[in-house]
């Protein structure tokens, strides 16, 4: 089975929504950066604006700015899809708020764990604690991935209307690269236990 099918081989730019959650989990949450980048790249023409996807992706790491970038992309996805007659609905406002709150909570959790380990020393990092941290990571990555399902569904409807092609059921080379990269993080986490 060829895992590298994409729109150039007769498939739309859509992505099975479940893949978003799976990719979120398996890439240690890093797939989200690619997801936002890919959508800025693909919607640049549809919006008719001089969007710079790389700069916006870097902006995801800048507090405050990232809030506006995330909210704007969720709104743009909804607006462009509606212009093409998409009937799927999601609240870009509530999706943005939930995504930002969860992302912030995960960042705070990570900082608190790091500060605690620095203060108390690495000897406090027991296998049980590592497993607990990994389960919390899994929970956050799952929830963040689930929040991208609704925007992905409306994107799929948009691409179906615009391109008239079937949705691909395979991963792109970029998605496979993120899986490998994220897999390394999971591997490092597991061998630490």
Listing of model-derived features with the role each one plays in the protein:
Residues 1-61, 65-113, 144-186:
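Membrane-interface extramembranous regions at the lipid-water interface
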Residues 102-144, 185-193:
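Membrane-helix interface segments in multi-pass membrane proteins
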């Amino acid at each position: 089975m060829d895992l590298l099918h994409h729109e150039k081989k007769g498939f739309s730019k859509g992505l099975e929504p479940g893949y978003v959650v799976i990719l979120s989990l398996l890439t240690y949450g890093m797939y989200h950066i690619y997801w936002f980048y890919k959508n800025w790249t693909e919607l640049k023409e549809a919006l008719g604006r001089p969007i710079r996807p790389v700069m916006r992706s870097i902006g995801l790491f800048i507090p405050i700015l990232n809030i506006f970038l995330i909210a704007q992309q969720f709104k743009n996805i909804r607006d462009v899809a509606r212009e093409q007659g998409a009937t799927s609905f999601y609240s870009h406002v509530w999706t943005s708020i939930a995504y930002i709150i969860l992302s912030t909570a995960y960042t705070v959790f990570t900082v608190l764990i790091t500060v605690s380990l620095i203060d108390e020393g690495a000897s406090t990092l027991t296998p049980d604690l590592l497993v607990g941290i990994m389960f919390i990571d899994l929970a956050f990555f799952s929830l963040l991935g689930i929040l991208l399902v609704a925007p992905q569904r409306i994107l799929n409807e948009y691409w179906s209307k615009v391109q008239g092609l079937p949705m691909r059921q395979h991963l792109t080379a970029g998605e496979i690269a993120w899986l490998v990269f994220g897999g390394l993080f999971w591997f490092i986490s597991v061998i630490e236990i």
